[in-house]
Amino acid sequence: MKEMMMSNMFNDVPTPWAMFFQDSATPNMEGMLELHNNVVFYLCMMLGFVTFMLYNMLTTYNKSVMPYKYLNQGQFMEMMWTTLPAVMLLMIAFPSFILLYMCDEVMAPAMTIKAMGLQWYWKYEYSDFMDEKGDTMEFESYMIPEDLLDEGQLRQLDVDAPIVCPVDTHIRFMVTAADVMHDFSVPSLGLKIDAVPGRLNQMSALMQREGVYYGQCSELCGVMHSSMPMKVEAVPTADFLAWIDEQ
């Protein structure tokens, strides 16, 4: 597994002029990519069929002054242009329903991370870990200003306190907000959860490889909306437990 990871370079950050998705790191995101590819395939089939029919009509029926002289009714044609789109829509709908159910289903999570959006930073809480006083572990995460970035850090993406998660672990993310609507979104993990004041939304993730994943608030929340990035570090379980002990 490690040899495969070392021989591949994954795109887990936004890049200039990007034309496709970031590389997936969870089964949910892998399913979204597969659904997208299938939908694009069906759309290309429909585009090709419609283009062929238009070309055929323009070239065939222009040869006669009265092209519809012997065409009294077109029941077969009407049946086909009703049935084919319906079948294609069903082929798109059923996989999307299955994926939607899988993304919403949170099955026996090993740990829970709560994320609260505030203007304009994130606050995280590890509900399963407590200190000697019995308080849960929590911290605030702010974007690093451009003039304080170190070499290799990303502008408007790096934060002073990232989320650290163990790989190959079912993690439940519970998201809410304290003031206005925000959105917790990490593309490589297939996470996009609305943060609504007074409401808890949840979604699960199973990170299948180590890496650093970036996201940004995807709900317009005010003048500093672009200053609410999120950074997720997926590390081995031993490194995660060592990080917990340091907090």
Curated annotation (Swiss-Prot):
Residues annotated for Cu cation A2 binding in this entry: C217, E219, C221, H225
Subcellular location: Mitochondrion inner membrane
Domain of life: Eukaryota
GO annotation, cellular component aspect: mitochondrial inner membrane
Mitochondrial matrix compartment spans: 59-78
Major location category of this protein: mitochondrion
Enzyme Commission number: 7.1.1.9
Cofactor needs: Cu cation
The protein's name in its UniProt record: Cytochrome c oxidase subunit 2
Designated gene of the protein: COX2
